């Protein structure tokens, strides 16, 4: 009981204690809450009260701690002294501050003067360097002039022959006539200009028998020829047209011979005469057979061996297009390479070889004698076997569906009309031409007709019979355009044709197109070729190609050229010596006579042909490097005198592989005077600049009060006859340099960019070198070409709004390129730059060269260019596809690189400098 009672009491005591603790905690919480409430309520009220009375307290403080009314404190002596000291110090501080500002202003002015002096010193150093370079160049030029032992060549001065001939000893037989014994060279001095006198056929009896179409075509081309003269006394060559005759008129040989010998300038033997017998039909007879032509040359399409004199007479082409120019739109494209038929032949043999020979011989006897065997039967059997094998699709027909055309004996007669034959040849990769079996025939009119019809439509001629004498064979490399196969190899012809690669086949097709267009397509080309052939044989240079006479617009110059704020700093490097007056023109006509002696094969077998003498070409030979140090250094400016070097030595001389030269800026403009003036000012101080030719394309003259900038070189403002973009590429006579920088009036180019482009062009003179690149893209859905200006890793064009090219291409663009292209440029007022790229790539088979990273040009303040218009691009698409039709193929080629200077992004030692700072 006791333990239990105690337990109960103990438990009761602990419970009371717990209750007390709970009550105490509650009291504390209550006081804490009350305290917080009082603080939160009364503290903001108190703060609000004091804040509202703050202004009154400030006023009271001012009254307590501030200066007393009446300067009560200043009545004390030491306080007054302190006040005076404070005022004195304040005044001194103000004076010192004014002096400090004045000194700072003077220091700033002196710093500006120092900077100006430094700049003047740098400019003086640059001027001194320029003067040293000019002095060095002048001394070098003087030494070259004193040491020069070669006469300076220029346009030949005409030396004309005397009226009377000295006479030539006659050869034993006219059959042995060659130039050295039947041609009077004394009437044709090298500088005579090759004057040609053309007889008027109507004044002679045979003139009334001439085919009117042939006579009209011949007279028209003779009147327009640059060599033709009306003064027979000074003529080097005399030309007479005797055929083709009208049907059925046949002039007897004796009668024709009598009329020839009665020509007023025949001089007993006809030396320096050429008798032309043009044929329009395949059956044109050999009019001059059995006619004694004396020492006169004969030019016709049909020759017998007994009358043909190699190296003296001329095999000419038939007159296919008598009066009309060929239509480029009707000529099939050169691509695809392979056409429907591998080869075709249509013809019919009217008279066999055996029946034409006066004495019948066996096949074996013919093989042993001079005349070749009659392989016609073997040829027919072989070609039919190829056709029956069906390995390739070929078409051979040895009988005509209709009446065959008249032809010479042993010759394969033509089938059908010309239009029908051309349609078949358009489907043929190769065109077989079987030469006549008559060994007496050197060439026949029918065989020549087959040859030129094949060339016209791009069927590669395959001539069976190596004995044939093709037209102008002395000059033309026919192996580049045709296959000449001996008749005994007829069984191997199929294998030979299948073995040709696409690239070889296209090269032959393109060369054949060039030969046809240049020498055989029109009456003009035939007559010009006959004269060019004789002129080349006697080594007389061609007539100089004409230049466009520049009609200058008078203008006032004198405004000092300003500094372009957009011009990037060229650094410490000079860009080259600024040439002193007078400007240095490129040498002209240095190869007047060597071209006709050493380079006539290239001129005859490459565009544009041998008809013009150019002042200079981009294909002139280059001397080896050591020649400039061993006697042939005239005009060369090697880097460091030959020792080479980095930036400073590089900028002091042009170097390179050709002598020194300058360039001409040609700038086309149209009613943008302010933009033009700004562009001209940016050319101030440009090294190696010879002249600026501004092509004023506007019908309105420049403003009378317009003051042109003085940029240190002449500015020639040329007025044009009409507003045409083709004027950009006219070969103006004011352009006296080989290098032309064609630039738009709104193009911004730094001097270092121009100089780098010029140096690159000097190493690639036959190509366009410039800045903005474009390319041609294949439109897969429409199977055509597109003009594309997007950024690309391939390009095929460099726009001529900022590009260097050779003046040679200006001649070709204006006088040689098909007129249809220039007409389209005028129609769209667009595409002239594309046309120039087509031309250069067609001539060289090379792409252009892009320099620097520029892709477009910005022109702040210029009106919006036409190139931003959608129609501009649509027109350029059309231009590209039209140009392809005219050329017959796409001449543009792709390139995947651009050119930068040699030391660009190269780490150099401290004593070396870069070629260009930014390029």
From Swiss-Prot:
Lumenal side: 52-919
Outcome of swapping residue 461 to L: In ISDNA; changed glycosaminoglycan synthesis
Annotated phenotype, changing residue 646 to C: Found in a small consanguineous family with intellectual disability; uncertain significance
Region (Required for interaction with REG3A): 1-140
Entry GO CC: endoplasmic reticulum; endoplasmic reticulum membrane; Golgi apparatus; nucleus; plasma membrane
Keywords: Cell membrane, Disease variant, Disulfide bond, Dwarfism, Endoplasmic reticulum, Glycoprotein, Glycosyltransferase, Golgi apparatus, Intellectual disability, Manganese, Membrane, Metal-binding, Nucleus, Phosphoprotein, Receptor, Signal-anchor, Transferase, Transmembrane, Transmembrane helix
Reaction catalyzed: 3-O-(beta-D-GlcA-(1->3)-beta-D-Gal-(1->3)-beta-D-Gal-(1->4)-beta-D-Xyl)-L-seryl-[protein] + UDP-N-acetyl-alpha-D-glucosamine = 3-O-(alpha-D-GlcNAc-(1->4)-beta-D-GlcA-(1->3)-beta-D-Gal-(1->3)-beta-D-Gal-(1->4)-beta-D-Xyl)-L-seryl-[protein] + UDP + H(+)
Record text about domains: The N-terminal glycosyltransferase domain (GT47) does not bind UDP and is therefore unlikely to possess glycosyltransferase activity.
Disorder this protein is connected to according to its UniProt record: Immunoskeletal dysplasia with neurodevelopmental abnormalities: An autosomal recessive disorder characterized by variable skeletal abnormalities and neurodevelopmental defects. Neurologic manifestations include intellectual disability and motor delay. Some patients manifest hypotonia and seizures. Skeletal features include disproportionate short stature, cervical malformations, epiphyseal and metaphyseal dysplasia, and rarely premature craniosynostosis with progressive microcephaly. Severe combined immunodeficiency with a complete absence of T cells is observed in some patients.
Protein's UniProt name: Exostosin-like 3
Species in which this protein is naturally found: Homo sapiens
Gene: EXTL3
